[in-house]
A protein has these predicted regions:
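Mobile "lid/hinge" segments at catalytic clefts and subdomain interfaces of large enzymes
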Residues: 1-90, 194
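Terminal amphipathic helices with adjacent charged low-complexity linkers/tails
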Residues: 49-55, 62-153, 157
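Active-site lining segments that contact anionic ligands and/or coordinate catalytic metals
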Residues: 3, 36, 115-117, 136, ...
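Single conserved hydrophobic/aromatic residue that forms the stacking wall/gate
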Residues: 197-207
């Protein structure tokens, strides 16, 4: 299959989460088109990403349409193996094997030949959400309020609900205590074994 390289540079700014980063990557890969292709992430920006951060990105391969998304093995990978209790002999074996097979990555690694290369400076990633209907429709958090208001009356489609102005004033009475309207936030337990939105990176939880 075609292999698309995705070069990561820089580092995320404080307060920007792995989810924000992943939504930006999904947006870029959807725009480029990676259906039926592999995506390999590389670049000096990898060093700033923990293994859970990388897993968050790889886990979203169905959302950006690729057959798979993966990261080469590096020192962070080995550190995670040690953290998870692997024996040093096992860690050394993984390193030796990956170096021999060309799966190892560090700052001295030559760039491979890819079908195409995309590039993202992680310092440019902004806090964001996606939707209202598709994960690749990323919206900066600073624009979310206006985007939400416009999506209510926009024609039905990927980013619209087709409501009339009169619909916006309608509300739903829940029991005898709560009056819900468009835009109200309701907290519910919606769980999944694998979705990004219910399986955040530890970085997201800590922040």
């Amino acid at each position: 299959p075609d292999v698309v390289g995705f070069r990561l540079n820089g580092a995320l700014n404080f307060g920007v989460t792995a989810t924000d980063m992943t939504l930006r990557i999904v947006e870029m890969l959807r725009e480029h088109g990676v259906v039926g292709k592999f995506v390999e992430f590389f670049g000096q920006g990898m060093a700033a990403l923990s293994l859970p951060d990388r897993a968050t990105i790889a886990n979203m391969a169905p959302e950006y349409g690729a057959t798979c998304g993966f990261f080469p093995v590096d020192d962070n990978t080995l550190a995670y193996m040690r953290l998870s209790g692997r024996e040093e002999d096992d860690v050394a074996g993984v390193e030796a094997y990956c170096r021999a097979q060309g799966l190892w990555y560090d700052s001295s690694s030559p760039e491979k030949s890819y079908t195409a290369v995309l590039e993202l400076d992680l310092s440019t990633v902004q806090p964001a959400l996606a939707g209202p209907k598709r994960p690749q429709d990323r919206v900066d958090l600073s624009n979310m309020a206006q985007h939400f208001k416009e999506s209510l009356t926009h024609e039905v489609g990927h980013s619209g609900h087709g409501l009339s102005e009169s619909d916006l004033s309608k509300s739903t009475l829940i029991g005898n205590e709560y009056d819900l309207n468009h835009g109200d936030v309701v907290i519910a337990a919606i769980t999944s074994c694998c979705l990004l939105y219910t399986s955040p990176s530890p970085r997201d939880v800590e922040e």
